[in-house]
UniProtKB/Swiss-Prot annotation:
This is Photosystem I reaction center subunit XII. It is found in: Plastid, Chloroplast thylakoid membrane. GO terms for biological process: photosynthesis. Keywords: Chloroplast, Membrane, Photosynthesis, Photosystem I, Plastid, Thylakoid, Transmembrane, Transmembrane helix. It is a single-pass membrane protein. NCBIfam families: PS_I_psaM. SUPFAM superfamilies: Subunit XII of photosystem I reaction centre, PsaM. One of its GO terms (cellular component) is chloroplast thylakoid membrane. It holds the Pfam family PsaM.
Length: 31
């Protein structure tokens, strides 16, 4: 089964979105 570009993109989004929110939250809390 070949890996699609779409699947890679979705996997990246799924990994990056929570990380982005965690980073934003961390900056808000450290004020």
């Amino acid at each position: 089964m070949a890996i699609d570009n779409t699947q890679i993109f979705i996997a990246l989004l799924t990994a990056l979105i929570p990380a982005f929110f965690a980073l934003k939250l961390g900056k808000e809390l450290s004020k």
